[in-house]
Each structure stands twice: as structure tokens, then as C-alpha cells.
Amino acid sequence: MSGSDINYMDDLYSKYKSDPHSVDISWQKFFEGFDYSITNSLGSVKFTESSVSQLIEAYRRYGHLKSLTNPVRTRRDHNVDFSIEKFGLSDSDLSQTFSAGSEIGIDNGTLKEILEKLNKIYLGPIGFEYVNIRNTEEVNWIKEWVENKWYSQNIGIDKKKSILTKLNEAVVFENFLHTKYIGQKRFSLEGGENTITFLNEIVNSACDNDVKEVVIGMAHRGRLNVLTSILKKTYDEVFNEFEGNMDPDKIFGDGDVKYHLGYNSYINRDKNNIYIKLIPNPSHLESVNPVVMGYVRAQIDEEYRGNFNSAIPILIHGDAAIAGQGIVYETVQMAKLKGYQVGGVIHFVINNQIGFTTDYDDARSSIYCTDLAKIIDSPVLHVNGDDPEAVYYASQFALEYRQKFKKDVFIDLLCYRRHGHNESDEPKFTQPNLYNLISKHPSPRDVYFKKIIEKDSEIDKGLADKLNKEFKSLLQERLNEVKQKPLPYKPQKKDEEWNFLRNSTSKDFISSPKTSINEKTINKIGKSLTTVPKGFKPIKQIIRLLKDRESNFFDKKLLNWADAELLAYGSLLLDNKNIRISGQDVIRGTFSHRHAKLFDASTNQPYSPLNNLSKEQANFNIYNSLLSEFGVLGFEYGYSMASPNTLVVWEAQFGDFSNGAQVIIDQFISSAETKWEKMNGLLVLLPHGYEGQGPEHSSARPQRLLSLCSEDNMVVANLTTPANFFHLIRRQLAWEFRKPCFLLSPKSLLRHPSVISNFDDFTNSQF
């Protein structure tokens, strides 16, 4: 120890002697041990109590690095040593009692008892990673949960049978598809079937805790199993898709492969209904993450009145994707932001220990694929994929933690992929050693059944065979029915909030719906936009802006671009339509034109004119976003997906920045309607034009957007008058359907004296 360390400890010890509660609990225990065990022997001091405290803390901090979480191969050696000699203890201390044992609930326990409990808690099938969290309340809560609830685990015989039954269904379903549809891609869950255990227990517990909705985002692996086991898509429907029993003439749009499709259903659990939704997604891994978060935020805002506990997002990742895809970082960074927080995401990693053909040591620099959890102080549970009871407890922890602290939580399921990346792929080309191990490894169901019949005499040894035969017989019956009589095409029901809308036709674009307003409404909105509360003192530039705006509305009756935009928003708010706008610097506007909120020069308190139009108006929310395009545009797309009656706007700082979100534009906005029958009314503003910015920030790349236009899938516009902008905004919600719209918005024209519109253009015109 350095001199500064010793001085620091002396100061702490002095504080402790004056008031034990003035120092952290860990130091209290340390100094208790110091006072208790200090003895003089040949001038040395023996810290036996403190040594035991240090041993306990070491297990808490590093135990996850030695936990038994890998079902198929030996873990890497992370040089973690829990030998008692390292802590100044010896075998002669094993029978000695230590008050430090009270830290883990063993008052005056022997060192042997303390070690046995620590090994059971921290070196078992779950590796708990939480000590790095900087919130003491959270750490203490987790510590209590781990060292009491997890340690005292006691799963009853009925729950064990329930877990086994669900796990059996997951295993048999995959095996059935593998034998009936040889070589067909399905991206099976084999090796990771306890994913179903986790999701099923989350849904069960969510029902018990009055959660109303669970929204899931995941990639292709295991999707068919999740659809049938969790969302109750019928086996008949899945077999019908494998059989190719689809009449293209009866299907709307182009459709998509079965492992990209979404689904939604109401599930009844013990008289409680819960709505479960699986968001459709493309092959672009992790791109669905912000979409799920946006969807859930919209539901929380509009359906559940701000109650974060009513809707839970679950994101299912792959180990290679969560570590490698930057969109994961972008969305995780939203966790605590006012405009984007969802009350915590439950992250679940299907950790196959491989990405297609890439080994984990080529896929990341970090020890764990979940290490980005540290940026938001989230706990991580690394769980053995062959232990469904550990998975059950992990599900309980995830839900309880999320509901209590409104924070993200990560569950890392260490498992394996029995086949290649898809069922026709040969994994032994690149991982022969690993796949030699996997080929000999029993399924998670077989591992679990062997475990419980050895421990529970009440379990019938023939139960596994019985469950296997019964479920396999059921699947065969469903397949036979489909082969004999193919199911007719039945589009999935729309979400309730979309029922009032219809699909568009080509005739809808010949003319626009009525979007004009009367002059009385203009004046009402204009008054709100040009006045501030008594005592509110903006800076002088804003005072000048308000005077100019007042002149535009009440003297000249000529409105510029920003006036027309705010007028459109105000009119929709008075029509009881909510508005949400986000993007980089959108409150002021990149070009200092919008000023949707004003700020007091002395207090910095904001004032929102558009939230002070009327007591009966709808909500206006505008958020400066984190510096992200991909994540934020995906979030707003998801928000709009859930809220067809809300105008959702994303504005790029400059139009060319939209290519940072190209995946969302290509795979969701432009194509979701034809692939998944999902309409969307998102409005995207892209500042565009050669005005002194050189090769960057000049072009919004209209050619790229136009190349995506097909069969009336979206609108691309480039306008020159404020009134037309006004009508375009209102048209987004005036249509009897929804279409995404990209507007190449101006820059210098924002203040050009010729770019104005008179009142008649707003009261007696349309787009």
C-alpha cells in the first residue's frame, strides 16, 4: 500500500471510531474485523476477520468469472484465485467461526460454512455481475436477492413438471421440423431451447404483476419456436407456411420469409390477459431494437398514461450481434433519456458462442458479449443454458429488477447451436472441435430430466417419454390436417388502433384531402406563438423574433416557413392529435428558425407555446435527441407504428445525415407495408440544398429515396412555399390511411423574403 492509501485508511478508521455509520457498510465490516481480530505477535497484526470479508467481497466481484455457465466446454481461465491462502487464511481456520459470515447471513459461521455458501451462490450455474453498479441501493437489493432468494431456491414438483413440459415442447418442435422439412431454413433454437423457458416464465410473472403488454424484438434464430410456444401461433399455420400453401394472388404485397414475420395475441394466464407482440424485422441484426423501444414508449405514453410498469420490452440478441452491431450501443444509450426511456429493457442473449462461422475471440475484444451493460450500470446474469431452473430464477430476477428500478437488465444464456448457421450449413468446416463436443451433447431437456429424476423420487421415470410421444403425436396430427386440407390465407388482424384506417389505392393520390383551417384558428395559434407568461424573460434575440412573428400573424398576414410549420402543429393539437418531434437540435432547429421552446434568460426554464393553446388540446412533445441517426429514426418509426393518430416527426440535422439511418429507411420505412402489411405515417424532414456547405451537408440524396419508391409505398417531396408545407404536415393525419413521407426541407429559404404565404393559402387551399 502507498502512503496515500494508509493515510486514507487512517482517516476512514478515525471516522469509524467516532461514528461507525459514517462509513460504507463494507468498511464497517472491515474495521469490525480489524478491532475483533487484531493481536500483537512478533510485532505483526493478524486480520482474520477482514480477510474473510475480503474473501466474501472477492466472490461477489469475481465469482462470475469462475461460475459453471458453459454447458459444452471448459471456460476460459481468467486468473481468478479463491484459495483461502491468498487471503491470509489456512486450513486451520476452516473450523474457526467468523462474525464476517453475517455479511452473507451466517452469524458466527465457520470458514468452511462460509465457503460452502459462497461456492453455491457464486460458482454455480449463474454468474452474477453487479458489484460494479454505482447505486448502493441497487447493489444491496441485488446482493440480498442473490444471497437469499437464489441461495434458498426451492422449486416445487409442479413447477418442475411445468418447466419440463414447456422445454419438451420446444425440443420436440425443433426435432419435428428438422425431420419433416430436411434442409429447409428455419434457424432452429436447438441447443438454446431454454430461451422458451425464460420467455414463458417472464410472461407468467408479468401476468401476476399486472403487466398489460410485452413487446418482443428478436432476430431469426428460434423465432418459429417463440411464435408457437409463447405467442400461440398455431402449429397448423407454421406447417402451412412450410408446405408453401399460399396463393400469391390473395396475399397483399410481397410478403417475407416466415422467420421475419411478426405476430400478436392475447394470452390468458390465471384469468389475467396479457397482450404479447413480436415486432417483424429484417435480416439486419439488432435493427429492430430501437423500433421495439419506440413502440413501447408510444404505448406507455398513450395507452398506459406514463406507467412504465404496464408495458415491458424484451430484446433477444445473438452474442456476436450484441457485441458487434453499433445500433445496440445507440439504443442502450437511450435508457435514461427523457425522450426515449421505456422504464427498462429486458435484454436476453442467445449466446451460441459463435457468429455464423466466427469464433467469439474474433467477434469481440471484451470478456463478455454483454459488457456494454456497464455503460448504464445494468446487472448481468450469465446463465447455463442446460439449467432451466437457473433460467427460471434469472427470469424472476429480470422482471423484479426491471419493475423496481425501471432499468435495463441483461440475461446472457450460455448455450450452443446444434447445427450450422442454418440447417443446410456445415459448421465443422471451421469449428470441428466444438461441433464434435456438441454432436455428443444431450439436449437441454434430456439434461434436465436426468437431473430431476435423480433428485426427485416423485418424478416418474417414464414422464419424459410420455411427454415426448404425446406432443410429437399432436404435431403429426396438425401436419396431416394441413397436408389434407391446406389452410386458406388469413391476414393477421390489425392492431386495434389501426382498425379505423384502410389501405390506400392509386386514386387517393390524384387529389389531397381537406387540410385547410379558418382564420379564427390561425389567430388563436398565432397569439400563443407570440406571447410568453408574465415574468418570463427571454433573451433579446427571442424578443425580436416574437415581435417579427406577431407582425407576420397580425399585421402582414404573411407567414414564413417556421410560422407555417408551427401553425400546422398547433392546428393538429387543437384537433386533438398528439405530436412528437425528435432529432438533433430540433427544439431550436439547426438553422435557428423553429424555436418550439423558449428559454428564460435568467433561469433557463423552458416555455412551450404549443402546449399553451387550449385546455382541451392534445400533447406536444419535442426532444433534442442523442447524437444518433440509426437509433433515433428507428425509435420514431416504432413510435409511429404504435400511434397512427399521432404525428411523429424525425428531423435530420442535415439531410445527408439520413444515410446514417439507411437500414431503417430501406428495411422498414420503405418496405414494411409490402413485406409485413404495416402502414406508418412517419414524417422525415431532411434539410437539403447547396448553400455554402461544400460537398457535405448539401444533398439529402433524393435519388436514393426516389429509387425506393414503388407502388405508392411512400411520399418524397420538395416544397417551395410555407403553405404547401403546412398542408403536407396536416395531410399526414388527414388521409384515411398512413404513408411515410420524406420532405427535402429548405435552408436559406427559411428566411428568404419571397418564401411566404398569405392567409388565403391556409384557409382556402390544400396540398
Where are these regions (language model features)?
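A structural-propensity feature for long, helix-poor, extended segments
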Residues: K86-K117, Y122, D256, T358-A363, ...
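Active-site pocket-lining segments that scaffold enzyme catalytic pockets across diverse folds
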Residues: V172, F176-D236, R544-K547, S551, ...
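Cofactor-binding active-site loop characterized by glycine-rich and histidine/acidic residues
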Residues: K212-D377, L381, F591-S643
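Extended, charge-enriched "interface" segments that sit outside catalytic cores
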Residues: F34-N194, V211
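Subset of Sec-pathway N-terminal targeting signals
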Residues: M1-F34
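Alpha-helix capping and helix-loop boundary segments enriched in small/acidic/polar residues
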Residues: G3, R186-E193, Y275-E286, G318-G326, ...
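Conserved phosphate-handling catalytic cores of large alpha/beta enzymes
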Residues: G355-S366, K374-F410, L414-G420, K428
